[in-house]
């Protein structure tokens, strides 16, 4: 009987804490054929509904427009990783930055804190417009 109670407690505490999952993404950003330097990229766990998204990692593109970020989160259900890109390519003097999101496929979710399978977003030309693109002043 004590063993059953202990197993129930362990199982319920696991459900409350969740399990550690990770994701990572790399890519290259260009603006009109030139490296997009210093562009802010953020990796989130997309929490749908009223719960705020969980920031997993953030960084900026280097002098070649390259970036690579990864992070982890404890969740009971599978994480829903997404990459937000904030930029000013072809933006003129408009306030705030252009923002768009790339959803990371579930096949790139890793168990544990170590990312073994990183999503390669490829080369992204920022000069065009993207589905769901908006503006963000407070990122």
UniProtKB/Swiss-Prot annotation:
Subcellular location: Secreted
UniProt KW keywords: Secreted, Signal
Keyword Secreted: yes
GO cellular component, one term: cell surface
Signal peptide annotation: 1-15
Coiled-coil region: none
InterPro entries reported for this sequence: Transthyretin-like (IPR001534), Transthyretin-like_sf (IPR038479)
Family: Belongs to the nematode transthyretin-like family.
Record's protein name: Transthyretin-like protein 5
